[in-house]
């Protein structure tokens, strides 16, 4: 009984509420915290997507290389439509059908194809067919231009054949699927009918093989090795300007500060590591251990020679990746090229970059040596941007 009375006394002696200022503010001070309005909050910077993040930033950005990619985008519809229409019967297409081919023709999804067609009145025209449907095709002026392009293809056939031979000589098994050559034909200036018209004319150079273990894929195989072709652009340049080639690439040796090397000593040390380079036509190159220095030299040489064989001395990521098996390339090709800024310039975004051979371009951003096909393309682009033919243009 005394225990119960004692417990009751203790309970009554405690206050129901603690009105101590200290305890009150320590337990319920949340109302004093002022909420910062959203517009004044420091925004966390979002990580930029590789799809939009540019490879180069100031001061390394070279505007004339970046502008070339803008030109590619500007004439995307023209180039894709030209290639697609050229393969159609009578080189015409019904407008209703064209509206469903945004990927093949290169116009934005959800947009009217007619709007893109009307941008190039000297190149493309629409007309109402006897079926009362609107069709479009090339203008008579464009037909004449295409005949000129065919002449270029015939005149340069020998050079294009040598380009393909060199690509085959660089490849690991001296074989390249015909589909890959076709997908990249514009890169090297190969005609549309290269497989069916050109290849059969050169049985002493090429052989078409059906690879059963690869779903019957048709592959172009090298018949004979030609030592006169197995000379890279770098090797030719070395004979003209040895010092320039020595400076083209850099494979630095890691060393501690204890060596106390000055700039000249470090340059000489790095040169020992950089030279000799490995020829892209080395038959042992594809067999090198992937992660050795010699293998990286070989892959850098492969990319350099690959670009030197292209019309514009440049290639997009999808062009290079398509040949990764043939040229023993790794997933680190992007990082490898970034390490060689003296020779290569990577333009565009991290997801869709284009690599240029810097020495092939002048300070004005123009190719120093232009292939006739490149000259034709530039003329076509000028006509494509005209609304009517100007007098004396092109004379």
Q: Where are the predicted features?
A:
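Charged low-complexity interaction tracts in eukaryotic proteins
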Residues: 57, 112-159, 202-241, 341-369
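General structural concept
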Residues: 78-132
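Short amphipathic alpha-helical interaction segments
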Residues: 107-118, 189-200, 329-339
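Positively charged, polyanion-binding regions of nucleic-acid-associated proteins
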Residues: 72-90, 155-173, 285-311
């Amino acid at each position: 009984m005394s225990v119960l009375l004692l417990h009751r006394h203790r309970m009554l002696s405690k206050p129901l509420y603690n009105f101590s200022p200290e305890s009150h503010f320590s337990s319920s001070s949340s109302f004093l915290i002022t909420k910062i309005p959203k517009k004044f909050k420091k925004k966390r910077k979002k990580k930029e997507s590789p799809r939009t993040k540019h490879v180069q930033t100031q001061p390394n950005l070279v505007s004339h290389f970046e502008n070339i990619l803008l030109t590619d985008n500007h004439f995307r519809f023209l180039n894709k439509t030209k290639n697609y229409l050229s393969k159609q019967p009578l080189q015409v297409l019904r407008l209703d059908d064209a509206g469903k081919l945004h990927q093949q023709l290169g116009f934005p999804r959800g947009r009217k194809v007619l709007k893109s067609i009307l941008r190039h009145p000297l190149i493309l025209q629409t007309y109402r067919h006897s079926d009362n449907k609107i069709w479009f095709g090339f203008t008579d002026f464009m037909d004449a231009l295409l005949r000129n392009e065919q002449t270029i293809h015939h005149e340069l056939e020998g050079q294009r054949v040598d380009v393909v031979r060199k690509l085959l000589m660089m490849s690991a098994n001296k074989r390249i699927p015909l589909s890959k050559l076709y997908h990249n034909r514009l890169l090297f200036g190969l005609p549309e009918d290269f497989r069916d018209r050109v290849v059969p004319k050169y049985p002493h150079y090429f052989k078409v093989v059906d690879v059963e273990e690869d779903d019957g894929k048709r592959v172009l195989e090298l018949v004979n090795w030609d030592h006169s072709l197995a000379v890279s652009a770098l090797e030719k340049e070395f004979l003209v300007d040895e010092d320039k080639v020595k400076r083209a690439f850099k494979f630095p040796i890691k060393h501690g500060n204890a060596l106390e090397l000055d700039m000249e000593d470090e340059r000489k040390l790095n040169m020992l590591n950089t030279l000799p380079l490995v020829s892209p036509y080395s038959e042992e190159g594809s067999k090198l251990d992937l992660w050795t220095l010699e293998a990286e030299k070989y892959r850098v040489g492969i990319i350099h020679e690959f670009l030197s064989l292209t019309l514009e001395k440049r290639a997009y990521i999808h062009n290079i990746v398509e040949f990764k098996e043939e040229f023993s390339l790794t997933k680190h090709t992007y990082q490898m090229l970034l390490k060689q800024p003296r020779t290569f310039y990577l333009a565009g975004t991290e997801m869709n970059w284009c690599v240029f051979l810097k020495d092939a371009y002048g300070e004005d951003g123009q190719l120093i040596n232009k292939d006739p096909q490149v000259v034709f393309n530039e003329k076509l682009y000028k006509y494509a941007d005209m609304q009517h033919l100007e007098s004396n243009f092109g004379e």
